Every structure is written in structure tokens, then in C-alpha cells.
Amino acid sequence: MNDVPNRPAVPRPPGYPADLERDWHTADGTVVHIRPLRPDDLESEIQFVQGLSEQTLYLRLQYSMREVSRADAERLLAIDYHDLMAIGALVDEPQGETIVGVSRYARIDDSDRAECAIVVTDAWHGRGLGTELMRSLGIAARARGIRTLEGTSLGENQR
């Protein structure tokens, strides 16, 4: 996203796929920055997970723990952009970029399959963001030789 005007350049980690950065517009015109997450997103990742409702945590991630330790968040951001990928949806807020959704994949062994998960903060449900995150994750996976994304969803998850 360093190609977006008025946005400061942020150092990218080795192997960072800048080609996956782009802006997406919701139906109401809100700009959402779609990009791979980076280690410097640590505080935003912690706030994102802690801001999810218990229902969203349970339906999307099958657990209800709302507290995330710094070490847990660091593990979530320890991605290599090949076998492990995390794509974030971020919006500009007065305090900086805020994560409002994340899609992830983890390659299964050394195969062309990966497990995936998507979670969107409650305020953004029903706006097409989950679909857009899945589309972005699919593009990233395909470019890295992953042909199948597998995910688990609870039956009561109707969103």
C-alpha cells in the first residue's frame, strides 16, 4: 500500500508480497485496505481479537477466549507468505489502521492443500468483507501452488 497517496512507507519483511496490496470499496464507498499482515501489525492484531464478540469467536474460530497474549499474537503474525499467509482488511481510523477482518491459510504438510479461516469483526458483518477476504486469500494461495482451501464451519454459523 505504499503506492497509495498520503500513506507513509512501512518497511516490508523479507518475502512480503506487495502485489497482494490493494484498496477495496464497500457498497457505501468505505475504503478498506486489503494486504498481507506484517509483524508491525501486532498491536492491531491484539485489539482485533480482543474486540471480537464471544459469538463471533465461537462461530468463526470455535473457541470463546477473548484475551490474546502478546506471544499468541506474535504466533498469528509469524507468517512466511508462502506456506502460512494472513491477509488483513484494514480501515483508517484517527489512531491509525485498524484491522476489521482477517483471512488465513496454513499449507497442509508439503501439499497443494491448505486449511483456511476467515473472521470479520461484528460491525463489518453483512458488508461483503468476508467474501472479499476469501477472494484475496484464494488469489494468494493459487499463486503459491495451493489448489484446495479447506475450512470448518459450525452448522449454526449462518452468516
Where are these regions (language model features)?
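Long, contiguous binding/interaction regions
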Residues: 1-159
